[in-house]
Amino acid sequence: RSLNMSETEIRDLKTAGLLHDIGKIGIDKQLFNKNGNLSDSEWSDIRRHPDIGYQILRSVDEFAPIAEYVLHHHERIDGKGYPRGIKGDKTPLQSKIINIVNAYDKMTRYRSYKDKLSKSEAIEELKRNSGTQFDQGLVEVFIKRVLGE
């Protein structure tokens, strides 16, 4: 609500947030739990999941409006994200929000390949990557309104 989104936009954001990784069903699940570094080929496979998710969602009339949010949820403000490498304002607001929430969730959960961070460590990581990986204003709203810091 801090972002002046309509009820429909909020509903679509919630749905896209729940389905943002649906494209992972098209990727070998062992890659997501692999200990150690991924090969270039394995990393390329993982980077396909937003495209796969986009294809799945746009083929279902009810989900077509959110397909683009899923497609761009790994894009970065500096254009170094994937799958398209688009910058800043060209990335949908909803995708930018999903990117931040997804990153925070990953940082604060146990993963086989990386230790989880505390809430304060994750907040510092979000701030450190603000303006490059994440939209700075959205990071500030997330920390203040969602995390209550």
Model-identified regions with their sequence ranges:
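Metal-dependent catalytic cores of enzymes that make or break cyclic nucleotides
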Residues: 1-149
